[in-house]
From Swiss-Prot:
Residues 1-18 form the signal peptide. Residues 889-938 are annotated as: Disordered. It is a multi-pass membrane protein. It comes from Rattus norvegicus (Rat). GO terms for cellular component: cell surface; cytoplasm; dendrite; dendrite membrane; dendritic branch; dendritic spine; endoplasmic reticulum; endoplasmic reticulum membrane. It catalyses: Ca(2+)(in) = Ca(2+)(out); Na(+)(in) = Na(+)(out); K(+)(in) = K(+)(out). Residues 603-624 dip into the membrane without crossing it. Glycine binds at residues 516, 518, 523, 688, 732. This is Glutamate receptor ionotropic, NMDA 1. One of its GO terms (biological process) is response to hypoxia. GO terms for molecular function: amyloid-beta binding; calcium channel activity; calcium ion binding; calmodulin binding; enzyme binding; glutamate binding; glutamate receptor binding; glutamate-gated calcium ion channel activity. NMDA glutamate receptor activity is potentiated by Zn2(+) in a dose-dependent fashion. The potentiating effect of Zn2(+) is at submicromolar concentrations and its inhibitory action is at high micromolar to millimolar concentrations. Excitatory glycine receptors are inhibited by D-serine at 100uM. Coiled coil: none annotated. Residues 19-559, 648-812 are extracellular.
Length: 938
């Protein structure tokens, strides 16, 4: 027993010298509460926390004050009554006076300066989520903007895709708008319209009239009590609170003055335990107690500041304690599970879904933090309806956007009276045209003005069919920028927006896209596509290589080298035949001894034989006689047969079976896969084809080449192909096949790739999407789409060469006719030469005959003189003179003609030499006769 007394005495003695080691650490927690009653509740909650944790190391101590009438007094009270007590955290609630939302502000500012955490109990204004202003503020209730999550969940449950967001242009309204738009983006949707009004405004009629013109009938309102009352009064005057409408509001909008004017059937929210200050006091104390025990287990913990006077040092452990608080998870709270997000706001909160019925709020469902659980049987909708409204009004006037893309949409100017010219299809039916407004870009370089034009084609016929089937009217306009639609960066930022028809649809400028818009994944993420009205793929357009028939077309079967060898062979064989027959002892022979010997084969005859065998013209005469020459002739005949047969076969292939070869084989052609500047191919900028090549990694090399050469429109690219500025154009097969059928110098090549389809584009929340798809499916079934295809796409103006046998034309055989004409001209030219030569030869022969006759007379005269006859015979003398006279005149004419034609050149001298001997003989004869006559006279 004495031993126990000694131990007890030793323990008490040691504690008297080391009290700090034995006494628990006192942790002060401050609070600014609305009433004395809540201060008592705060102290009880602290005592309960001490008992719950039961730690002898730490003891929580409650220090509290009530709200002061103004901000200065409140800040002084925080400094003098709370911070001076070295509080680790401060709890703050709202004062009992309504609409005093700024009372927590002096507490937040004062404590935040020293980095002392502040826990709001009933403060729901979104401004306290801004940590650049309220550095150390946390709260056990969510902000009003958190109600956007409940609205979004109700939209999902009731499948409401058309909404109008009506918000006040203040911090609370903007916060609610931002949160809801973020949630809608995750769902790939958006509000049909966001309408803002200034806080405190007394007239929102114009704003509500704008909302009434929209399709959406679900109106989400975020405003203060007074502003909400103003909106309700204006909506009632415009009959916007009756059947068909849905009003979703928050807690403020069904409180106080707003509730007096709220229409029956409105759906509002109330935070469960949102105004239960005692419950939030208990939960806040539990969170702080849990965080304090976790904090004090760490090292280097400093004490909070003591007072504000002369103290400007922040609490170094304050930021750490705030992080510990924000990471706390208090599962046993009176108000439910308590957790904080990165802004210090409560993550999970439960709401009651309230329905105003006969001026009383009735709970018709709950929101458990993640899902809405409604009780549809208890809900009374606006107008006393018990059935859920569909949330939209089917507008019967739609704005249609399209694009100029033949044959789907043709665009032509209107006539002078503003109407469209009447035209007929290939079937004889009148072309259905509609007035469409769009930019007038017919004059390059001039400013683009929006003017009425005439639109018709495949898509216009389809639009007319849909409008008649689904009972709506429309107004058509052409897309302003001429693009189908792709995403592009805004001002070099990371934000991307759609341009073209996609941009107009998403921005609300159009309700529907009726155009050859390709269905792809990128677009389908943002808009809703109908069932395809036209299936197609991608193909390649090139300029057709039309064979040009030249005058030497008949020579195409053989190359130039082969023609030269054939021509050389003809003459070599002719010479060899002549030589063999010439030197053969049997080249000339007689049938019997009485007959004369036959003439040998001449070179001319050998040439005729060689050409005759080659051209199969028949040999009448001049055949070789010797055996050796005839052997060569037979070999030459065989050679000629093979050459002629080969030529005939190739001539048929070139002239009859000729087809233009495709320049490229398809998407895997080496000239496409390995691009070069010598072969240019492209597509349309910011189109689905452009997106396809950009997304495909294996086509990245092709895309880099195409990107530099892409065109603004398909029409420009097609014209570039025709002008040889572009070698290949990659685009939708339906369009390119039509262009190739209309423009005979173009042809598509290769197999289809990236198969897809054309669809009608609508917004995700469009009420028409299901009906449009059903109508298109019915049009496929009843053959209407097939008729449109035949009328607009399959109509061909160019003859299909593959369906008709190829025939020879004059162009193919013009060279042969020119060869015959050349032969005729050559024959005529040669006949004149032959005639001239013959005349020349006859004249010369006559001269020689006269010369020989004169010589004979001269000889006779000489013989007569030698025989002793003194007087010549007068007849012979007369004959001699006649001959000499004729020769002289002949020589003079010949000399004059030669001198004239040759200019006294070498030709005349040569001709004179040819007749010098006869002329000299005659001159000598004349001289002798004159001497004889003078001698006789003497």
């Amino acid at each position: 027993m004495s031993t126990m007394h000694l131990l007890t005495f030793a323990l008490l003695f040691s504690c008297s010298f080391a009290r700090a080691a034995c006494d628990p650490k006192i942790v002060n927690i401050g609070a600014v509460l609305s009433t004395r009653k809540h201060e008592q509740m705060f102290r009880e909650a602290v005592n309960q926390a001490n008992k719950r944790h039961g730690s002898w190391k730490i003891q929580l101590n409650a220090t509290s004050v009530t709200h002061k009438p103004n901000a200065i007094q409140m800040a002084l009270s925080v400094c003098e009554d709370l911070i001076s007590s070295q509080v680790y955290a401060i709890l703050v609630s709202h004062p009992p006076t309504p609409n005093d939302h700024f009372t927590p502000t002096p507490v937040s500012y004062t404590a935040g300066f020293y980095r002392i955490p502040v826990l709001g109990l009933t403060t729901r204004m979104s401004i306290y989520s801004d940590k650049s202003i309220h550095l150390s503020f946390l709260r056990t209730v969510p902000p009003y903007s958190h109600q956007s999550s409940v609205w979004f969940e109700m939209m999902r449950v009731y499948n409401w895709n058309h909404i109008i967001l009506l918000v006040s242009d203040d911090h609370e309204g903007r916060a609610a708008q931002k949160r809801l738009e973020t949630l809608l983006e995750e769902r790939e949707s958006k509000a049909e319209k966001v309408l803002q009004f200034d806080p405190g405004t007394k007239n929102v009629t114009a704003l509500l009239m704008e909302a009434r013109e929209l399709e959406a009938r679900v109106i989400i309102l975020s405003a203060s009590e007074d502003d909400a009352a103003t909106v309700y009064r204006a909506a009632a005057m415009l009959n916007m609170t009756g059947s068909g409408y849905v009003w979703l509001v928050g807690e403020r909008e069904i409180s106080g003055n707003a509730l007096r004017y709220a229409p029956d059937g409105i759906i509002g929210l109330q935070l469960i335990n949102g105004k239960n200050e005692s419950a939030h006091i208990s939960d806040a104390v539990g969170v702080v107690a849990q965080a304090v025990h976790e904090l004090l287990e760490k090292e280097n913990i400093t004490d909070p500041p003591r007072g504000c006077v002369g103290n400007t040092n922040i609490w170094k452990t304050g930021p750490l304690f705030k992080r510990v608080l924000m990471s706390s998870k208090y599962a046993d709270g009176v108000t439910g599970r308590v957790e904080f997000n990165e802004d210090g706001d409560r993550k999970f909160a439960n709401y009651s879904i309230m329905n105003l019925q006969n001026r009383k709020l009735v709970q018709v469902g709950i929101y458990n933090g993640t899902h809405v659980i409604p009780n549809d049987r208890k809900i009374i909708w606006p107008g006393g309806e018990t059935e859920k409204p569909r949330g939209y009004q089917m507008s019967t006037r739609l704005k249609i956007v399209t694009i100029h893309q033949e044959p789907f949409v043709y665009v032509k100017p209107t006539m002078s009276d503003g109407t469209c010219k009447e035209e007929f299809t290939v079937n004889g039916d009148p072309v259905k045209k509609v007035i469409c407004t769009g930019p007038n870009d017919t004059s390059p370089g001039s400013p683009r003005h929006t003017v009425p034009q005439c639109c018709y084609g495949f898509c216009i016929d389809l639009l007319i069919k849909l409008a008649r089937t689904m009972n709506f009217t429309y107004e058509v306009h052409l897309v302003a920028d001429g693009k189908f639609g792709t995403q592009e960066r805004v001002n070099n930022s990371n934000k991307k927006e759609w341009n073209g028809m996609m941009g107009e649809l998403l921005s609300g400028q159009a309700d529907m896209i009726v155009a050859p818009l390709t269905i792809n994944n990128e677009r389908a993420q943002y808009i809703e596509f109908s069932k395809p009205f036209k299936y197609q793929g991608l193909t390649i357009l090139v300029k057709k290589e039309i064979p040009r028939s030249t005058l030497d077309s008949f020579m195409q079967p053989f190359q130039s080298t082969l023609w030269l060898l054939v021509g050389l062979s003809v003459h070599v064989v002719a010479v060899m035949l002549y030589l063999l027959d010439r030197f053969s002892p049997f080249g000339r022979f007689k049938v019997n001894s009485e007959e004369e010997e036959e003439d040998a084969l001449t070179l001319s005859s050998a040439m005729w034989f060689s050409w005759g065998v080659l051209l199969n013209s028949g040999i009448g005469e001049g055949a070789p006689r010797s055996f050796s020459a005839r052997i060569l002739g037979m070999v030459w005949a065989g050679f000629a047969m093979i050459i002629v047969a080969s030529y005939t076969a190739n001539l048929a292939a070139f002239l009859v079976l000729d087809r233009p070869e495709e320049r490229i084989t398809g998407i895997n052609d080496p000239r496409l896969r390995n691009p070069s500047d010598k072969f240019i191919y492209a597509t349309v900028k910011q189109s689905s084809v452009d997106i396809y090549f950009r997304r495909q990694v294996e086509l990245s090399t092709m895309y880099r080449h195409m990107e530099k050469h892409n065109y603004e429109s398909a029409a420009e690219a097609i014209q570039a192909v025709r002008d040889n500025k572009l070698h290949a154009f990659i685009w939708d097969s339906a369009v390119l096949e039509f262009e190739a059928s209309q423009k005979c110098d173009l042809v598509t090549t290769g197999e289809l790739f990236f198969r897809s389809g054309f669809g009608i584009g609508m917004r995700k929340d469009s009420p028409w999407k299901q009906n449009v798809s059903l109508s298109i499916l019915k049009s496929h079934e009843n053959g209407f789409m097939e008729d449109l295809d035949k009328t607009w796409v399959r109509y061909q103006e160019c003859d299909s060469r593959s369906n008709a046998p190829a025939t020879l034309t004059f162009e193919n055989m013009a060279g042969v006719f020119m060869l015959v004409a050349g032969g005729i001209v050559a024959g005529i030219f040669l006949i004149f030469i032959e005639i001239a030569y013959k005349r020349h030869k006859d004249a010369r022969r006559k001269q020689m005959q006269l010369a020989f006759a004169a010589v004979n007379v001269w000889r006779k005269n000489l013989q007569d003189r030698k025989s002793g006859r003194a007087e010549p015979d007068p007849k012979k003398k007369a004959t001699f003179r006649a001959i000499t006279s004729t020769l002289a005149s002949s020589f003079k004419r010949r000399r004059s003609s030669k001198d004239t034609s040759t200019g006294g050149g070498r030709g005349a001298l040569q001709n004179q030499k040819d007749t010098v001997l006869p002329r000299r003989a005659i001159e000598r004869e004349e001289g002798q006769l004159q001497l004889c006559s003078r001698h006789r006279e003497s």
